[in-house]
Amino acid sequence: DERHDRRISETLEVRGAQLRFEGKSQRKPLDLLKALIALGGRDVPAHVLIELLWPEPLEDGGQKALEITVHRLRRLLLSDDAVRVTDRRVTLDATLAWVDAWTLERMLAALVGTGGAPEPAIEGLEAAAARMFELYGGEFLAGEPEAPWLIPIRNRIAGRFQRIVLRLGAHW
């Protein structure tokens, strides 16, 4: 399976094997992955990532540092196609990288869109609730220091999760 897995619980699995990271060698690629996920993962402007990851001014404006870090992240994910850079925009390929936070957000958005509890199939609702609880392991990237770019996704996921839990509770 060519899918990669980035979990809220701070683990990274590549082709089913959990990776362990020691030292600083993988810090920037992992920071890039976290930032990409937090910013939606699709067409994230390179300058935004550069400002987040290298707040201190760099000679070339950070472009070379970003290129090197993208290359290192691709190696880490075992796929040159997992991260694309087109027209100074960076994308994490969702067909190659499965992100539990994105799956959870889609699930929560769908449940919010149906009023939180689709009536036709209670067993389907129970399965959706079980999956939602499985995916939501707590605050998004809870072990990370408070960063301005993490706050929106943390609040969005937590808020939607709380609203859905309250709505689901009303049905049981």
Please give the residue ranges for each predicted region.
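Short acidic, hydrophobic short linear motifs in intrinsically disordered regions
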Residues: 43-51
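Generic beta-strand structural signal
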Residues: 7-8, 85
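Intrinsically disordered, charged and Pro/Gly-enriched terminal/linker segments
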Residues: 21-30, 35-42, 54-64, 82-172
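C-terminal flanking helix
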Residues: 70, 74-81
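Short, Lys/Arg-enriched N-terminal segment that forms or immediately precedes the first helix
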Residues: 8-21
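Residue-level signal for inorganic ion chemistry
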Residues: 49, 73, 132
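Conserved catalytic core of two-component sensor histidine kinases
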Residues: 67
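Low-complexity basic/metal-binding stretches
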Residues: 1-7
